[in-house]
């Protein structure tokens, strides 16, 4: 049962991160298409957002390992 819980935790966190990253990058591309001069500022904000979104799957993997090991 712990193995199933760990797999679900990893899968859902990866799914959420994929959707979140897709939304962040698509909105950044739209912003650059509308205002090309703001490209540098938008890219910096995008990388911060992607980094924050990617932190969640890492936390999910850690929790899954703790669940599986415990």
UniProtKB/Swiss-Prot annotation:
Family: Belongs to the ATPase C chain family.
Residues at the site labelled Reversibly protonated during proton transport: 54
Protein name from the UniProt record: ATP synthase subunit c
Statement: the UniProt record of this protein carries the keyword Magnesium: no
Pfam families for the chain: ATP-synt_C (PF00137)
Lipid bilayer topology: Multi-pass membrane protein
Subcellular location: Cell membrane
An annotated GO BP: proton motive force-driven ATP synthesis
Upper classification of the organism: Bacteria, Bacillati, Bacillota, Bacilli, Bacillales
InterPro entries in UniProt: ATP_synth_csu_bac/chlpt (IPR005953), ATP_synth_F0_csu (IPR000454), ATP_synth_F0_csu_DDCD_BS (IPR020537), ATP_synth_F0_csu_sf (IPR038662), ATPase_proteolipid_c-like_dom (IPR002379), F/V-ATP_Csub_sf (IPR035921)
Subunit structure: F-type ATPases have 2 components, F(1) - the catalytic core - and F(0) - the membrane proton channel. F(1) has five subunits: alpha(3), beta(3), gamma(1), delta(1), epsilon(1). F(0) has three main subunits: a(1), b(2) and c(10-14). The alpha and beta chains form an alternating ring which encloses part of the gamma chain. F(1) is attached to F(0) by a central stalk formed by the gamma and epsilon chains, while a peripheral stalk is formed by the delta and b chains.
Annotated TM spans: 4-24, 45-65
Encoding gene, per UniProt annotation: atpE
A single MF term (Gene Ontology): lipid binding
Function: F(1)F(0) ATP synthase produces ATP from ADP in the presence of a proton or sodium gradient. F-type ATPases consist of two structural domains, F(1) containing the extramembraneous catalytic core and F(0) containing the membrane proton channel, linked together by a central stalk and a peripheral stalk. During catalysis, ATP synthesis in the catalytic domain of F(1) is coupled via a rotary mechanism of the central stalk subunits to proton translocation.
This protein's GO CC annotations: plasma membrane; proton-transporting ATP synthase complex; proton-transporting two-sector ATPase complex, proton-transporting domain
Keyword set, alphabetical order: ATP synthesis, Cell membrane, CF(0), Hydrogen ion transport, Ion transport, Lipid-binding, Membrane, Transmembrane, Transmembrane helix, Transport
């Amino acid at each position: 049962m712990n193995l199933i819980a760990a797999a679900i935790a990893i899968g859902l966190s990866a799914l959420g991160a994929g959707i979140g990253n897709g939304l962040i990058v698509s909105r950044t591309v739209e912003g650059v298409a509308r205002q090309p001069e703001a490209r540098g500022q938008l890219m910096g904000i995008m990388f911060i957002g992607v980094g924050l979104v990617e932190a969640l799957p890492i936390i999910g993997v850690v929790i899954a390992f703790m669940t599986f090991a415990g």
